[in-house]
């Protein structure tokens, strides 16, 4: 296991248990489902209506702290009013860890399911199509 993942005392088994906690694993799946694998905070909040916004934020932050997820932001000059400017993706180490532990097997299926969601709120579609750091 890469020493940068989790903490120095975290074993791979403990990290698998950590990422497969129901809410955190749903959030990882939301990242994988996103067309650019780079959702804003709003999109996972919308896709998990039974989970409070505060809980989504808390678990995203835990995934960031464990180096599974990385927060990326648009530069000040690239930001647009009314659009998100912070986004979340799997870190390189996080993706590698998930692949090593066979936790990305459904990635393509998740993207296909996401593509079939027909009743996305207007705001979600707007945010989904917002400029991302890789677009600019």
Enumerate the language-model features and the residues they cover.
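Short coil turns linking two alpha-helices in DNA-binding domains
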Residues: 51-57
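Short alpha-helical segments that sit at the start of domains
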Residues: 2-29
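A short, conserved structural fragment
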Residues: 64-76
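Short acidic, hydrophobic short linear motifs in intrinsically disordered regions
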Residues: 36-47
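Short, hydrophobic-biased segments on the C-terminal half of alpha helices
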Residues: 57-64, 79
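Short, cationic-aromatic polyanion-contact patches
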Residues: 16-23, 74-100
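Short helix-to-turn junction characteristic of helix-turn-helix DNA-binding domains
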Residues: 31-35
């Amino acid at each position: 296991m890469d020493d940068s993942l989790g903490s120095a005392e975290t074993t791979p088994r403990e990290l698998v248990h950590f990422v497969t906690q129901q809410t955190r694993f749903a959030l990882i799946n939301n990242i994988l489902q996103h067309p650019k694998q780079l959702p804003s905070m709003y999109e996972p909040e919308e896709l998990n209506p039974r989970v409070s916004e505060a809980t989504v934020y808390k678990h995203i932050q835990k995934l960031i702290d464990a180096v599974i997820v990385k927060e990326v932001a648009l530069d000040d000059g690239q930001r647009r009013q009314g659009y998100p400017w912070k986004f979340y993706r799997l870190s390189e180490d996080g993706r590698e860890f998930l692949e090593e532990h066979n936790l990305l097997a459904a990635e393509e299926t998740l993207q296909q399911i996401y593509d079939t969601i027909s009743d996305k709120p207007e705001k979600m579609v707007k945010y989904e199509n917002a400029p991302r750091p890789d677009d600019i």
